[in-house]
């Protein structure tokens, strides 16, 4: 007997639901195989990855500093990623995230992107503000 929710009918297949739970790291991409020595930054979406995003209904990606060379290039890459997702059977957009922790870890150049305070400084406000910044 298949598992079913009594609250909502599933709209997507199990495979689509699993794909939506995946967030892939595309920091580097090498055309020929999975080499541990691959250090070619992925700054534009290769056809192989575009096909995989569409075929497997991937839910999201995480970008790193290697993926972001300029604002224009990052916009183009994001557009390529969303175009690939639009060709999936679910037609859902990707959740695009970036490894931007604040503080010393700043993947986006501070001169072209809004800089946010780090988690440590938010935590330091607990005594005065409690958990109001946690929501």
Where are each of the predicted segments found?
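Short, charged beta->alpha transition segments
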Residues: 46-50
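Enzymes and membrane/adaptor proteins characterized by extended Gly/Ser/Thr/Asp/Glu-rich
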Residues: 29-33, 37-42, 52-135
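Short, flexible, glycine/charge-rich loop motifs used to bind or transfer phosphoryl groups or to couple energy/partner
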Residues: 12, 51-52
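Boundary/entry segment of secreted carbohydrate-active catalytic domains
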Residues: 2-45
């Amino acid at each position: 007997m298949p598992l079913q929710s009594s609250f909502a009918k599933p709209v997507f297949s199990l495979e689509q639901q699993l794909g939506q739970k995946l967030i892939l790291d595309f920091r580097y991409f090498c055309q020929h195989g999975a080499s541990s020595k691959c250090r070619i930054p992925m700054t534009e979406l290769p056809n192989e990855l575009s096909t995989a995003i569409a075929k497997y209904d991937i839910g999201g990606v995480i970008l790193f500093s290697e993926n972001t060379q300029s604002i224009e290039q990052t916009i183009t890459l994001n557009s390529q990623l969303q175009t690939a997702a639009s060709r999936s059977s679910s037609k859902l957009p990707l959740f695009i995230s970036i490894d931007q922790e604040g503080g010393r870890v700043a993947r986006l150049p501070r001169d072209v992107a809004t800089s946010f305070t780090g988690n440590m400084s938010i935590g330091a406000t607990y005594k005065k503000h409690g958990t109001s910044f946690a929501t």
